[in-house]
Regions:
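Generic low-polarity alpha-helical segments
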Residues: 13, 17, 51-53, 71-75, ...
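Small/polar-rich, solvent-exposed N-terminal microdomains that initiate assembly or binding
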Residues: 1-65, 108
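Short, surface-exposed loop and linker segments with low hydrophobicity and enrichment for Pro/Ser/Thr
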Residues: 44, 61-70, 125-130
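Acidic-leaning, charged glycine-interspersed low-complexity segments
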Residues: 22-27, 46-49, 96-145
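Secondary-structure boundary/capping motif
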Residues: 30, 36-39, 68-72, 95-98, ...
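Oligomerization/assembly interface segments of phage tail-like spikes and tubes
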Residues: 66-83, 131-143
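Extracellular/virion structural assembly segments
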Residues: 64-70, 78-104
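Charge-dense, low-complexity intrinsically disordered segments
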Residues: 3-7, 86, 90, 127
Length: 145
């Protein structure tokens, strides 16, 4: 059984993703996407692509006494839009494809992750204030102990 003080599914998911999502810039060049959890994303000097992991809804205790939990995380993909405001769909789709294989039905530490079957993703949207296009992948988690 897990204690409330150990309830950090975002850290566990970050561990699964860190260093494993690559962005192909050209045939010769690629880079690794940076991963941020809530409260860690800087306000300046963000890369052209990055991923943010945020809590998405409530955490539910599945047992009495408490010890087994379930919840959701939003995994938000950010990609700097082209100069005309259109999305770099190939890059976003590449990131999404990698996330699907890294996250769906995977465990890290005391947590199990799967893509939420009832609310998989949100469509690509553009934020003119930031210049980024985003897509959100909804991930369910539960504790394994």
């Amino acid at each position: 059984m897990i204690k409330l003080s150990e309830l950090h599914p975002d850290k566990a998911l970050e561990t699964l993703l860190e260093g494993n999502v690559s962005i192909e810039i050209s045939e010769e060049e690629s880079r690794v996407a940076l991963i941020y959890r809530q409260g860690e994303r800087p306000n300046t000097d963000l890369g052209d692509e990055f991923i943010e992991i945020l809590p998405n809804g409530v955490v539910r205790a599945m047992t009495k006494p408490m010890g087994v939990y379930r919840g959701n995380l939003a995994v938000i993909l950010y990609c700097k839009a082209q100069s005309d405001g259109t999305a770099k769909e190939n890059r976003i789709n590449s990131m999404l494809s990698q996330l699907e294989s890294l996250v769906n039905c995977k465990s890290s530490g005391k947590f199990f992750f799967e893509i939420n079957p009832s609310n998989v993703i949100t469509p690509i949207s553009y934020n003119s204030a930031t210049g980024y296009t985003t897509m959100t992948l909804n991930v369910e988690w539960h504790t394994t102990e």
